[in-house]
Each structure stands twice: as structure tokens, then as C-alpha cells.
Swiss-Prot record:
Key words of the record: Cell cycle, Cell division, Cell shape, Cell wall biogenesis/degradation, Cytoplasm, Peptidoglycan synthesis, Pyruvate, Transferase
E.C. number(s) listed in UniProt: 2.5.1.7
Sequence positions bearing 2-(S-cysteinyl)pyruvic acid O-phosphothioketal: 115
Gene source species: Shigella dysenteriae serotype 1 (strain Sd197)
Catalyzed chemical reaction(s): phosphoenolpyruvate + UDP-N-acetyl-alpha-D-glucosamine = UDP-N-acetyl-3-O-(1-carboxyvinyl)-alpha-D-glucosamine + phosphate
Pathway named in the protein's UniProt entry: Cell wall biogenesis; peptidoglycan biosynthesis
Positions bound to UDP-N-acetyl-alpha-D-glucosamine: 91, 120-124, 160-163, 305, 327
Protein name: UDP-N-acetylglucosamine 1-carboxyvinyltransferase
Length: 419
């Protein structure tokens, strides 16, 4: 397995161009199965999960090409089963199920894999499809969905806020007969982006970005060209990297209005932040950040995917900060690894109490999930000496060319090929 070797400490300075959002690109790629004409999707990041999704769409019979943009022609889809060998590495493949059953009346997806963060059941996807009239069976490790004729619009109240299930229900409802209302819907920018993509193809959707989404079913969806929004988590990760290194950075191709909660906390930590239409600058003026208290919750609150990065910020900040995780259990696996680098933290149920230290020391650490592993790489950027981060395949699932982007900001980082 590949590793990163990072020599620190470095003060990050310069510009970084933000990639398209993985968490919008994936649902949009699967939503392309609904289209009866070719679609072009721009600003799709080059990531392992994206490659896996494109491979999966090809196996279903879609024509998929990448030349800058991703081109998908799903007219000839004739296989309705997403097999285990592709699904096992990636939870997002569950998003193939709704479009398949909505357009073709049948679909089956192997139960998914992905990051090992807490319980992420597919129950909410299943109950949403059942409420739209699909028959669901769980057999031999597969979720099998079918419907006679079209799905039927329904008034669906989500038991809990779920980005994944909101995507499944919204995509499926675009081709259902009648109107679907989703109450307690997820409000994430990636949901809005997926809805806007579907609207480009001819879907009738309103209320995306609120907790009540209304979808009027249409007979068919056509083609179109759509640009994926910038990755707010990648943006936030680079902003934190600059903040903890007391540096100065400009993020280009960013979307500031998707990061309100994160930018507010960075300002609390002492960062001087300016924003334009598609850029964000951060300058620490050489100062050490101040500890901040953070509580994760569904959008528009503070995102769970930025929790590990802010845990690290607090561990090198002035003072003591509390980080409370309310979205996923089992999401503090980076904390013991950071302790090996000299960090002082205590975990009490779903809260980490961070006591800031002046500096970290390089160490050998291991990545456990996508965002935790990013925080270990950032720790290596500011630690004294050499840090080796093992199991970085987690990072490759969510960050495009992170080492090249860090190098351009002055970091001494190299990828060491594994056995």
C-alpha cells in the first residue's frame, strides 16, 4: 500500500485550485441513468470512487467516456444489477438502485462497503423506495427492487436527515407518476447540485436546499450539460492546513456560500478571511490559531466531514477546545494517531477535549477513514521531523492529487509506492 512521507514543519503559502465535489459528482453520475439522451458532466474530480462509479455504469450498459468532462449515454442500459466486486469498495453504488427501478422497473445492488464510520444502514433508501411503490427484497446480499409500471408519487417524512436517502428518493421521484414531497430532507449543497442537474435534464423539482423538497414526476428525462459544484470539504481542508501552519493561502474555483459555518469558526480561530464570488483567501499573519468549540450537525450547521481537521487545529491552538460529533459514531479514530505525534486530547463519549500544544513531532501513523487521514497528512505538514502516513488509499478516495496541491503550497511531501 502507498504511503505519504512528509517533512515538516512548513508554513503553507500560495494558491490552490479546488476540484469538483466528490459528494455531488457521485450522485450526479448515478442520476445520469435516468436520462434517455447523452449527458456531459463537467468539473468531475479524478478519484477512485469516481472511476469505480464510471466502471459500474459501463457494466450496466451505459457508454461512458472521459476527456476532461465525463460523457454518459445511458440509452442502451440493459443490465440492472450492480455486482459485489464493484460495490464492495464504495457505498455510493446504492444510488444506482433508485434510477434503475424508476426508469426500467427493476434494479439490484449488492449491499455496499466504503468507510468504516459507524452504522450507515441503507434502510432509509429502502423505505423511501417502498413508499414510492417499489417492492424490495433482500436476497443473497443484494437489495432487489422492482415495480409494475411507474413508481407513484408519495408524501414521505424522513425518520432522520439522510443525504444518501434524500438523493435516492429525489432521483426516483423524478420519473414517478404524480407529485412526491420529501419532508425532513437533507439540505446539503450537494443535494441542491444533484437537483439542479436533474432540472437540467427536464425534471420538475423545487425546494432543494430546504427541508421540504417537492418533485413533480415527468414521463422522461433528456440530456444536457452540467458543471459539478466545487468541493467545500477540500476547500475547508486546505484552509485549515494554512491556518495551523500560520500561513497564507488563496483557494480558487471555490464556492464560499457553501462554507459559512466553517469560515465562521476559522475567523473565531483568528484567521483573516476574505471571499469573492469563486475564491476564498486566508491569512494568519504568522499567528498561532486560537482554540474553538465545534459541534457537528447536518447542513447548514458545521459539517462532520470537517471535524477531524478542526480537531487537529484545536490540538495545536492556544487554549482548550471541545469538539462534539453528533452525526456519526466512531469518528475519532484519528485522535490516538495524533497523540502519537504529541497531541493532548481526551475523548468523552461523543466529545474530544483538545488541549493545544506548541508543536507536534513527526511519527509513523495510520489512516483509518477519508477525512481522518487528511488530518494526519496536515499534521505531518506542521510537525517537526518526518511523518509517514500509511494506508493512504482512503485519501485517494476523496482528494484529487492532494500531494501535488500541497507541494505547490511549499510542503515537502512524497508518495512512497507500497509493496
Amino acid at each position: 500500500m502507498d504511503k505519504f512521507r512528509v517533512q515538516g514543519p512548513t508554513k503553507l503559502q500560495g494558491e490552490v485550485t479546488i476540484s469538483g465535489a466528490k459528494n455531488a459528482a457521485l450522485p450526479i453520475l448515478f442520476a445520469a441513468l435516468l436520462a434517455e439522451e447523452p449527458v456531459e458532466i463537467q468539473n468531475v474530480p479524478k478519484l477512485k470512487d469516481v472511476d469505480t462509479s464510471m466502471k459500474l455504469l459501463s457494466q450496466l450498459g451505459a457508454k461512458v467516456e472521459r476527456n476532461g468532462s465525463v460523457h454518459i449515454d445511458a440509452r442502451d442500459v440493459n443490465v440492472f444489477c450492480a455486482p459485489y466486486d464493484l460495490v464492495k469498495t464504495m457505498r455510493a453504488s446504492i444510488w444506482a438502485l433508485g434510477p434503475l427501478v424508476a426508469r426500467f422497473g427493476q434494479g439490484q445492488v449488492s449491499l455496499p462497503g466504503g468507510c468504516t464510520i459507524g452504522a450507515r444502514p441503507v434502510d432509509l433508501h429502502i423505505s423511501g423506495l417502498e413508499q414510492l411503490g417499489a417492492t424490495i427484497k433482500l436476497e443473497e446480499g443484494y437489495v432487489k427492487a422492482s415495480v409494475d409500471g411507474r413508481l407513484k408519487g408519495a408524501h414521505i417524512v424522513m425518520d432522520k436527515v439522510s443525504v444518501g436517502a434524500t438523493v435516492t428518493i429525489m432521483c426516483s421521484a423524478t420519473l414517478a407518476e404524480g407529485t412526491t414531497i420529501i419532508e425532513n430532507a437533507a439540505r446539503e449543497p450537494e443535494i441542491v447540485d444533484t437537483a439542479n442537474f436533474l432540472i437540467t435534464l427536464g425534471a420538475k423539482i423545487s425546494g432543494q436546499g430546504t427541508d421540504r423538497i417537492v418533485i413533480e414526476g415527468v414521463e422522461r428525462l433528456g440530456g444536457g450539460v452540467y458543471r459539478v459544484l466545487p468541493d467545500r470539504i477540500e476547500t475547508g481542508t486546505f484552509l485549515v492546513a494554512a491556518a495551523i501552519s500560520r500561513g497564507k493561502i488563496i483557494c480558487r474555483n471555490a464556492q464560499p456560500d457553501t462554507l459559512d459555518a466553517v469560515l465562521a469558526k476559522l475567523r473565531d480561530a483568528g484567521a483573516d478571511i476574505e471571499v469573492g464570488e469563486d475564491w476564498i483567501s486566508l491569512d494568519m499573519h504568522g499567528k498561532r490559531p486560537k482554540a474553538v468549540n465545534v459541534r457537528t450537525a447536518p447542513h447548514p450547521a458545521f459539517p462532520t466531514d470537517m471535524q477531524a481537521q478542526f480537531t487537529l487545529l484545536n490540538l495545536v491552538a492556544e487554549g482548550t477546545g471541545f469538539i462534539t460529533e453528533t452525526v456519526f459514531e466512531n469518528r475519532f479514530m484519528h485522535v490516538p494517531e495524533l497523540s502519537r505525534m504529541g497531541a493532548h486530547a481526551e475523548i468523552e463519549s461523543n466529545t474530544v477535549i483538545c488541549h493545544g500544544v506548541e508543536k507536534l513531532s513527526g511519527a509513523q501513523v495510520m489512516a483509518t477513514d477519508l477525512r481522518a487521514s487528511a488530518s494526519l497528512v496536515l499534521a505531518g505538514c506542521i510537525a517537526e521531523g518526518t511523518t509517514v502516513v500509511d494506508r493512504i488509499y482512503h485519501i485517494d478516495r476523496g482528494y484529487e492529487r492532494i500531494e501535488d496541491k500541497l507541494r505547490a503550497l511549499g510542503v515537502n511531501i512524497e508518495r512512497v509506492k507500497g509493496e
